[in-house]
């Protein structure tokens, strides 16, 4: 039996079958959600965290943001019962013997700090392996609170929470996806499960929107970095890993933490196209092939264009790359642009691309205007 992949508009409800042995993902329900083209703003690598939950009796809240898919061991039990790879709360009870059931308002919650504040385009509430102990429904709210607020500050009465996903029934052992159409910048989410139960993973897809005051204070920074508002627009091949890995923070940690393409059997080449945070002047380039040893790109070139209708201008000609090496290049003069493209020859991979520079006056003004429009 194989995992089920219905249309992107599918909504999963109801129990999954009890685990019957073999591959636990064989009857997992999922869909190809269009919003997953965006970056995961709740990525631990970006600095996201689950900072509080009202209950985590059976399984800890931090599991929600673990990078890999949830694991299941049918024989793994502890002193409190079955150990699950997710966030699981105790069973709610009513106030008395006459009313033993939870009320319609009863729910459990977890507070999530986004690693990169931004506009949320979609949320996946994954109940993998929670077959009969998943929540009846979930809801998701968002707030924009500057600085580094504590859980108590986020729960204060003066914090305005906006509904991103209304209370909606979900299914067990399924990727429950929700498109979000709220055009606002958020820093924190509150995930609610009604009335109780377990969630394996949470993914929050969207566009990072950085604070322009912070970028102005930095002066020179990586203008294509995900955390600074850069994003991948398209790529020629995503066979082994996502192109967004190339603009993640820090150095690659292992081979699959970069971007690797399938082997080419023609005379073409592979590429990634990026949108910069805003119009910027680029002064230096880094291309890192860390952990890519027998599968590193052989050569790379970098081009930029200024505006959607601009022409591509090569700023780094086709240059030989070494495996498992960080390559640094300085430009003879700053080059202004809004988009960038890296071409690798003939195939293979790179782990990171860095474009160091600063916002132009026009770019800073546009970023500030968008930040303010989004409620930043």
Swiss-Prot record:
Spell out the molecular function terms from Gene Ontology: allantoicase activity
Cited InterPro entries: Allantoicase, Allantoicase_dom, Galactose-bd-like_sf
Q: Name one GO biological process term.
A: purine nucleobase metabolic process
The family database entries (Pfam families) matched by this protein are listed as: Allantoicase
> Which reaction does this enzyme catalyse, per its entry?
allantoate + H2O = (S)-ureidoglycolate + urea
Per the UniProt entry, the Enzyme Commission number(s) are 3.5.3.4
Pathway, per UniProt?
A: Nitrogen metabolism; (S)-allantoin degradation; (S)-ureidoglycolate from allantoate (aminidohydrolase route): step 1/1
Q: Provide the alphabetized UniProt keywords.
A: Hydrolase, Purine metabolism
Query: Which HAMAP family is this protein grouped with?
Result: Allantoicase
Designated name of the protein = Probable allantoicase
Source organism per entry reads Streptomyces avermitilis (strain ATCC 31267 / DSM 46492 / JCM 5070 / NBRC 14893 / NCIMB 12804 / NRRL 8165 / MA-4680)
């Amino acid at each position: 039996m194989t995992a089920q992949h219905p249309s992107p508009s599918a909504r999963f409800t109801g129990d999954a079958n009890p685990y019957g042995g073999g591959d636990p993902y064989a009857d997992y329900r999922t869909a190809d959600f269009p919003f997953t083209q965006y970056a995961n703003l709740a990525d631990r690598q970006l600095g996201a965290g689950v900072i509080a939950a009202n209950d985590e009796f059976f399984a800890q809240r931090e599991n929600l943001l673990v990078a890999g898919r949830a694991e299941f061991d049918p024989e793994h039990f502890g002193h409190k019962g079955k150990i699950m790879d997710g966030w699981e709360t105790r069973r709610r009870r009513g106030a008395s013997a006459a009313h033993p059931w939870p009320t319609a308002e009863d729910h459990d919650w977890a507070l999530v700090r986004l690693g990169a504040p931004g506009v949320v385009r979609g949320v996946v509430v994954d109940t993998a392996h929670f077959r009969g102990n998943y929540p009846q429904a979930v809801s998701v709210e968002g707030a924009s609170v500057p600085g580094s607020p504590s859980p108590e500050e986020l729960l204060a009465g003066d914090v305005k929470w906006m509904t991103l996903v209304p209370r909606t029934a979900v299914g067990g052992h399924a990727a429950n996806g929700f498109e979000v159409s709220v055009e606002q910048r958020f820093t924190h989410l509150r995930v609610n499960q009604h009335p109780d139960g377990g969630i394996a993973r949470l993914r929050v897809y969207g566009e990072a929107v950085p604070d322009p005051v912070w970028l102005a204070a930095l002066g020179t920074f990586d203008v294509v970095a995900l955390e600074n508002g850069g994003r991948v627009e398209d790529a020629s091949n995503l066979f082994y890993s996502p192109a967004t890995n190339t603009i993640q923070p820090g150095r690659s940690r292992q081979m699959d933490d970069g971007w690797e393409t399938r082997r080419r059997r023609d005379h073409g080449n592979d590429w990634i196209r990026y949108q910069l945070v805003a119009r910027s002047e680029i002064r230096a380039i880094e291309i890192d092939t860390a952990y890519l040893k027998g599968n590193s790109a052989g050569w790379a070139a970098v081009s930029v264009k200024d505006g959607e209708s601009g022409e591509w201008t090569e700023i780094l000609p086709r240059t030989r790359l070494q495996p498992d090496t960080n390559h640094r290049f300085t430009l003879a003069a700053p080059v202004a642009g809004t988009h960038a493209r890296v071409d690798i020859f003939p195939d293979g991979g790179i782990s990171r691309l860095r474009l160091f520079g600063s916002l132009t006056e026009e770019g800073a003004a546009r970023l500030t205007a968008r930040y303010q429009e989004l409620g930043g």
